[in-house]
Amino acid sequence: MHVASAARLGPDYQPCHYGRSKVSFRGPRVEPAGRYAVFLGGNETFGRFIERPFPALIAAAAGIAAINLGCANAGLDLYVKDPSLLEIVAGAETAVIQIMGAQNMSNRFYVVHPRRNDRFVRASATLKALYPEVDFTEYHFTRHLLMALRDQSPGCFELVVEELRAAWVARMRSLLEQVSGRAILLWLSDRAPEDDAEELSPGGEPLLVNREMLAALADTGAELVEHVASPAEIASGREAMIYSELEQAAAREMLGPRVHADVAARLAPFFGAGHEMKRPA
């Protein structure tokens, strides 16, 4: 696998801030004024190891102002609990929301960090009662915690999954209520919503989200766009990714620039850019 110089992207990809939010986003900063689109999501929307993620491709092709609020390892809490970000969402003509996993948000069983949603902060009394034998101080990330809970007691783990899924649907509905313009839900993954959503090993995002959960949002008026990346599609873009040797493992979990180009082409008609963008051959 080719490893390019990470210097081309710069440290943290030109971080910028919006309003009073303490979260850093990928630059360059776009002023949230007039007509604009906003993109919310995790690693793929942020565009880790990619020079031009799909929000930038759409902006260039459609000639629109596009605010990329994608954030590495983001969960829904990053947005629904930040007034500055919700204000941007409410003012957007179109809001594209990448479907994010259900593990990275606070719920009845545990609390996550308000900005780094993949960080496990503490277990609730309810979870401690469900798993009295677990030392929760040993875990710092939500995925590792869930893997341990599943291994300890698959039966109790199903109760946790049920709670996370219910909380995810409620949180998504809350976020969609803040959208004044058109809302587009983007399923961007290497698996279909019908596939195993409980695979906890690296990859498999959005974790724990399935078709039933998407169907529960059908009455919100949001449009659903599904893009399931094939292995060939992912592999064909690897050479164009930019990362250091230390980042190789993380880069292998990303879908890559070919997928971003294809996704941009799928979304282009929503922005009047259907004739300007063509999917790669």
Where are these regions (language model features)?
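Polybasic, low-complexity association/targeting segments
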Residues: 1-4
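Serine-esterase "nucleophile elbow" of acetyl-processing enzymes
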Residues: 9-90
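Alpha-helical cap/lid subdomain in secreted, periplasmic
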Residues: 87-281
